[in-house]
Amino acid sequence: MKKILLLGGSAQQTVAIRAAKKLGYFTIVCDYLPDNPGQYIADRFYGASTTDVEAIYEIARKEGVDGILAYASDPAALPAAIVAERLGLPTNPAKSVEILGLK
């Protein structure tokens, strides 16, 4: 089963978690908030900030994820791209994501 790491578990982000599960992914959510609804839907939850690149990297590496998604979260987009690049996963180029964040 493929694994996907989703950065954030807020109510808005549960849409992506549910969609990934429906597509057959093992879902892993990381969020620094201890009681977001996504953690109750995901297959696994980590209490880590979605902007902490090193924490995200360690989780993604440990879990052997096939992809990283920052859905409905501008602050998590760049960390997702940086970590995906480091792990050789499909992603938008981190430099492009960084530039797009300068809005």
Q: Language-model features: where?
A:
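ATP-binding N-terminal substructure of ATP-dependent carboxylate-amine bond-forming enzymes
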Residues: M1-S96
